[in-house]
């Protein structure tokens, strides 16, 4: 939590795959801004991505009370949307300790450990082997 010009700002960081999102919650009317662009525009108006970003706020019924300002880097839209979700959930935990239990129950605070598996030598991809010839 930090305050600038007597406005309380809550910070949270979220990660998914190679995406890292730094999320700020500022008292407002519920607008979402991602990298300086409107949230729905940035996420290509995809309802699944928008729902993921709004999920932590809707869980607590605060979707119209805070503006979400996001700086996100790396990865694609799926990873970025989930990173924003986790960052927003962590910022809401900073807001009040009572918010932690419902957010944890819904799974918004969990870091998804799945990431791209590394390529191994002798193989074409992580697990795809070259065609086998018996003779």
From Swiss-Prot:
Swiss-Prot/TrEMBL keywords: Ribonucleoprotein, Ribosomal protein
Pfam families assigned: Ribosomal_S9
Residue ranges with Basic and acidic residues bias: 102-115
Superkingdom assignment: Bacteria
GO cellular component, one term: cytosolic small ribosomal subunit
Transmembrane segments: none
GO molecular-function term, one example from the UniProt record: structural constituent of ribosome
Stretch list, region Disordered: 102-135
Composition bias, Basic residues: 116-135
InterPro entries to which the protein is assigned, alphabetical: Ribosomal_Su5_D2-typ_SF, Ribosomal_uS9, Ribosomal_uS9_bac/plastid, Ribosomal_uS9_CS, Ribsml_uS5_D2-typ_fold_subgr
One BP annotation, GO: translation
Family: Belongs to the universal ribosomal protein uS9 family.
HAMAP family: Ribosomal_uS9_B
Record's protein name: Small ribosomal subunit protein uS9
Originating species: Synechococcus sp. (strain CC9311)
